[in-house]
Regions:
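Flavin (primarily FAD) cofactor-binding/catalytic cores of flavoenzymes
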Residues: 1-53, 59, 101-212, 216-440
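Charged, low-complexity intrinsically disordered tails and linkers
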Residues: 50-51, 57-60, 69-76
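Short Gly/aromatic-enriched secondary-structure transition segments
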Residues: 63-66, 360
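Flavin (FAD/FMN) cofactor-binding and adjacent substrate-gating region
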Residues: 67-100, 259-267
């Protein structure tokens, strides 16, 4: 009997998660907490598949000393269930660091510590996750969906579920025409690839981008390679500080999602425009001041190892075996300079991974708005034309749900809303007359 046919004999899952980063991890915890207190008939069965060999969240950006830009209280659970045993505070207690963290007097743990928290939480629901397992496509079936999975050893298996939840995370975004290569990296891979420079004594490193990731990459490379010139190229005249003021931060509140979802399209566009400086192409003020102070002290000493090439853009990139020639244009004058660099790092942002290649023929049943964007209900369920199982999106919903679509800020609440939506639809299905007849 084939592995696929063996899989088909298993019960149909209520929820099948595709991807197991922070968003679907929060969902797994929400399901686990529901099942702990629910009667057996009300529990949810679930499984999560992730193509990574083990849990990981942006490992290539885990620069030592960098801090989270979101409060630890916006962890996997607290905004949904402050009493949860999966909170960041519970993690600290388990690690015997609670008092130490309190004495640290910060709301923002380092990224390395927060990643350790995520790994700790993932291990506690590890029985729900299947790593080294890539979902290839899904097909509608009477029970919901049949999902084909390729495992690390090459086996293909199938699983069935009434609902699927996509949480595919982010992928690198680079300028049109740009190509990554041996000497051209994206900052998502910075910590994975920086070891390639060991023993090479690089002379010049160039970073392109205007946001937090670009500033962090610039700072890290400048500190790590004390003999190298580090050039930061960005089109603004100066780095823009992130607006993390209290009133602006309300745009990340759960209530703001309600307001945004119900707003007219022109109001949504206004809100996105007003508050882009909370998240996009902005830098923490402390880091801006640190980079400026460093550049100034170099000027005092009569050297210039940190170069901030503001109001500039890259016009050409020529990669060779020993380096990459980066042509930079100063926008006010049009003057061009070629930077012969050992490495070029694009820190030009990320975009949500598109789930629709996995949907196959199912995609034609998904409704779209007048702009061709996917139509999504308030509970993150894709609106479909026919009676399909539930398709839920964690990410890629900025046009309907606002800035928190791909951020950690609302992850705990969103997970609870998706779980509760699945329960609500299941109750409705069970109360239908044809369900009672089929059970009789």
């Amino acid at each position: 009997m084939s592995a696929a046919s063996t899989e088909e004999r298993r019960p149909v899952h209520d929820i099948l998660g595709i991807g197991f980063g922070p968003s679907n991890l929060a969902l797994a915890i929400a399901i686990e907490e529901h099942n702990r207190d629910a009667a057996e008939s009300d529990r949810l069965s679930c499984a999560f598949f992730d193509k990574q060999p083990r849990f990981g969240w942006h490992r290539g950006m885990l620069i030592e000393g960098t801090t989270m830009q979101v409060s630890f209280l916006k962890d996997l659970v607290t905004m949904r269930n402050p009493a949860s045993g999966f909170s960041f505070l519970s993690y600290l207690k388990d690690q015997d660091r609670l008092a130490d963290f309190i004495n640290h007097k910060t709301m923002f743990p380092t990224r390395v510590e927060y990643h350790d928290y995520l790994e700790w939480a993932a291990a506690r629901v590890g029985h729900l996750a299947r790593f080294d397992s890539e979902v290839l496509h899904l097909t509608p079936v009477p029970e919901g969906f049949e999902v084909v999975v390729r495992h690390g050893d090459g086996r293909l298996t199938t699983a069935r579920a009434r609902n699927v939840v996509f949480a595919l995370g982010l992928e690198a975004s680079v300028p049109d025409g740009a190509r990554l290569g041996d000497r051209v990296w994206h900052n998502l891979d910075l910590m994975h690839r920086v070891g390639e420079l060991d023993g090479t004594r690089p002379r010049r490193l160039t970073v392109v981008g205007a946001g937090q990731s670009a500033a962090e990459a610039t700072d890290y490379l400048h500190r790590t390679f004390p003999e190298a010139e580090v050039c930061s190229v960005f089109s603004r005249y100066g780095h823009t500080p992130a607006d993390d003021s209290p009133f602006a931060n309300r745009i990340f509140d759960p209530l703001a999602v309600d307001h945004f979802y119900g707003a007219p399209e022109e109001v949504k566009e206004q809100l996105m425009s007003y508050h882009r400086n909370t998240n996009y192409s902005v830098v923490d003020l402390d880091l801006i001041e640190e980079l400026y102070a460093r550049a100034y002290q170099e000027k005092v000493r009569g050297e210039q190892r940190l170069r901030m090439l503001n109001a500039s853009r890259v016009t050409d990139v020529a990669e060779g075996p020993d380096g990459v020639a980066v042509t930079v244009e100063f926008l006010p004058t049009g003057e061009r300079e070629v930077l012969d660099s050992d490495v070029l790092v694009y820190a030009t942002g990320c975009r949500p991974r598109d789930p629709f290649p996995l949907l196959g023929e199912t995609a034609r049943h998904c409704e779209r708005d007048e702009r061709g964007r996917i139509a999504v209900e308030r509970d993150y369920r894709v609106r479909t034309r026919d009676e399909l199982g539930g398709i839920y999106l964690q990410g890629g919903t900025e046009h309907t749900h606002g800035l928190t679509s791909s951020l950690l800020s609302n992850g705990a609440v969103r997970a609870g809303e998706i779980r509760d939506s699945v329960l609500r639809h299941r109750r409705a299905a069970r109360s239908a007359p044809d369900y009672a007849l089929s059970r009789g």
